């Protein structure tokens, strides 16, 4: 949507993966100093998985679990497949060392072009008019993977820019029950109204 605003009629994104890299499921990927993917400067582990108000798994535990299961198919590897430059071996370069959590500053810098919040902020003069009425995002306030946190940062940026983006937080909903209560039907109706505006009942 952000890359091709003239082509798409809108986006209705639910529980979007980190849209602001200042909170990439924990670490801030926008800082210049050497950073760690597993813990903050004080050594406190970044939590990742929560359910019922309880933190169940840290980011380090999650990454190590994926490593045991295999390189391909995991969430962290999928981020690298999309965002990372290609290494000498032809594979996506890892953002962080799986043993220590140390972030590779070269890869971190390469990821910045996918930081949606920053892309919007720095290109708003051009993108703003093209995205008017097109941005709709939904997330639970208790998202299982803390995805509400980067979305709140994006919401703040959108307000500063005067955007009409509709960012909605569903109280108490997690990553897995977000659609309860008719959200699917609501999104479908809104999409249909854009795609088929002349059809009766579309709005």
Residue ranges and their predicted role:
Residues 1-203:
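Non-catalytic cap/lid and distal C-terminal segments of serine-dependent acyl enzymes
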């Amino acid at each position: 949507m952000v890359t091709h605003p003239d082509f798409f009629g809108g986006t209705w994104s639910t529980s979007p993966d980190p849209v602001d890299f200042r909170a990439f499921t924990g670490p801030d990927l926008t800082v210049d100093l050497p950073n760690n993917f597993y813990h903050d400067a004080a050594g406190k582990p970044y939590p990742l998985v929560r359910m019922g108000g309880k933190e169940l798994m840290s980011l380090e535990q999650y990454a190590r679990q994926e490593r045991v299961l295999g390189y391909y198919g995991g969430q962290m590897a999928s981020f690298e497949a999309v965002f990372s430059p290609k290494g000498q071996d032809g594979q996506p370069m890892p953002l962080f060392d799986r043993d220590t959590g140390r972030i590779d500053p070269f890869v971190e810098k390469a990821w910045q072009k996918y930081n949606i919040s920053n892309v919007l902020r720095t290109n708003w003069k051009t993108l703003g008019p093209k995205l008017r009425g097109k941005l709709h995002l939904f997330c639970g306030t208790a998202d299982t993977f803390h995805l509400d946190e980067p979305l709140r940062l994006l919401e703040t940026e959108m307000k500063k820019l005067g955007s009409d983006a509709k960012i909605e937080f569903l109280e108490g909903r997690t990553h897995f029950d977000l659609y309860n209560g008719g959200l699917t039907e609501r999104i479908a109706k809104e999409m249909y109204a854009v795609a088929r505006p002349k059809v009766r009942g579309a709005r």
